[in-house]
Amino acid sequence: MRIFISYIIISFFLASAVFSDEKPGRNFTDLPDVDDGYNIHVMYVLPKDGVDKDYDLNSKISMLMYQIDKWFNSKTKDRLFTNGQSLKFDRKDDNKIDITFLRLDINDDEISKHGIQAVNILQPAISRFGFNDPKKVYFIIYGGSNRDVCASSQLPSYATEGVTANTAALYYPGKRSG
């Protein structure tokens, strides 16, 4: 019996080490801001049972943000601003986008079943981990699924009472059938 219990304990610790989210270059906190203004803070958020694809480390998210900013700039050029307007992302000292990794304590099914309202599950979840700065808009790249939509954002009338509607989510890989 002791051998069996020892085997279970060793297996648990080995599994924890193999599936650890800690990797070189990964940030688990919002790094100090390079300016004290309002910013868009980007987060790579996984559900408890989500598979880590290293999107925060392999430039997938950075390139996505670059493309979004490029599109936004092209749509504002010669309309509102002569040279266009850029989005103000939260940046690190080296001018790269500050991307925070967070694994939630909620399974994907519990989040994805809420469809377009899933962002109203994600926002309080990230807030419990301290991501609730009133000067930030949280842009979540959610590494799980959603049954209805590929993205959603909070509307003040749907946000939990006492919570600032400051979160948008992109469900990547996205919508799933079911």
Give the location of each predicted region.
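Bacterial N-terminal signal peptides
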Residues: 7-15
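Propeptide-to-catalytic entry region of secreted or membrane-anchored zinc metalloproteases
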Residues: 21-137, 141-156
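Sec/Tat signal peptide C-region and signal peptidase I cleavage site
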Residues: 16-20
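Positively charged n-region of N-terminal signal peptides that target proteins for export
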Residues: 1-4
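Active-site scaffold of zinc-dependent metalloenzymes
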Residues: 148-178
